[in-house]
Design a protein with these regions (language model features):
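Glycine-enriched alpha-helix->loop->beta-strand junction motifs that scaffold or abut catalytic
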Residues: 20-25, 82-88, 108-113, 132-138, ...
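C-terminal alpha-helical cap/extension of soluble enzyme domains
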Residues: 69, 181-244
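Catalytic beta/alpha-barrel core
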Residues: 5-9, 25-36, 62-64, 86-100, ...
Length: 244
């Protein structure tokens, strides 16, 4: 069954997500970009709050929307984020010439790294093939431009199916604990297609917020999403709140 990853920006949102049925807690600042990073102090506070509350859910955090060069800056940020106590560190991998060197360097980090392939310009087959041959904790596909629709508006289902199949069948990831996930402005209405793809996890932010992805996490929307993912309710979202 596909697990539910919910992206949060604060202690309060993290506790709401944990209580509302999230299987993964993902830490990022939506107002700072697709993979916007949170301050290190906030990462430490959220991890401590979840563990103090008794939650053992896996926690991931992004390093922020950093360019892959200079590589030293990326690796320094990876180490700093990992030191905050998160279980996984997510790093965006755009389709550019620096991706191969970045993937090789990230694979050597003493942390559980999840490269996140940015799908807006398409996936470079050679970059995905390289990543699948390296000992990463998992691989994801996501979108950068959240105003361009959901992931399904950027990649068609056959391409997504091929991505998931390649992650699961290739290199050190095959038969291991490596995870294959999808994200990218996913909506409640996308759930039938998400279920059909059966990724290990699917990431949500916009669908569980009041207003856009920069708004506050909405417990009612989270409950509706959780129930819908498990087939408990029809796929109809809560009514939109009127904006002032």
């Amino acid at each position: 069954m596909t697990k539910l990853l919910v992206s949060v920006r604060s202690v309060g949102e993290a506790l709401i997500a944990a209580a509302g049925g999230a299987d993964f807690i993902d830490l990022k600042e939506p107002r700072s970009g697709a993979l916007g990073g949170l301050p290190l102090a906030t990462l430490r506070e959220v991890v401590a709050a979840l563990r103090t509350a008794g939650s053992r859910l896996p926690i991931s955090a992004t390093i922020g929307d950093l360019p892959l060069a200079p590589l030293a800056s990326v690796l320094n940020r990876v180490r700093a984020v990992a030191a905050c106590g998160v279980d996984y560190v997510k790093v965006g991998i755009p389709r550019d010439a620096h991706a191969p060197a970045a993937l090789l360097a990230l694979a050597g980090c003493d942390a559980a790294i999840v490269p996140v392939f940015i799908a807006d310009a398409g996936l470079a087959p050679e970059h995905l093939q390289l990543a699948c041959a390296l000992p990463f904790a998992g691989l994801m596909v996501d979108t950068f431009d959240k105003t361009a629709g959901s992931l399904f508006d950027v990649m068609d289902e056959p391409a997504l199916r091929d991505f998931l199949a390649q992650v699961r069948a290739s290199g050190p990831m095959a038969g291991s604990a490596g995870l294959a996930g999808i994200a990218g402005a996913l909506r409640l209405a996308d759930l039938p297609r998400v279920r059909a793809l059966t990724p290990d996890f699917a990431g949500f932010r916009s669908a569980v917020c009041s207003g856009d992805r920069g708004g506050a996490l909405d417990p009612a929307r989270l409950r509706a999403l959780h129930q819908a993912m498990h087939g408990a309710v029809a796929l109809s979202p809560p009514p939109e709140r009127r904006r002032a």
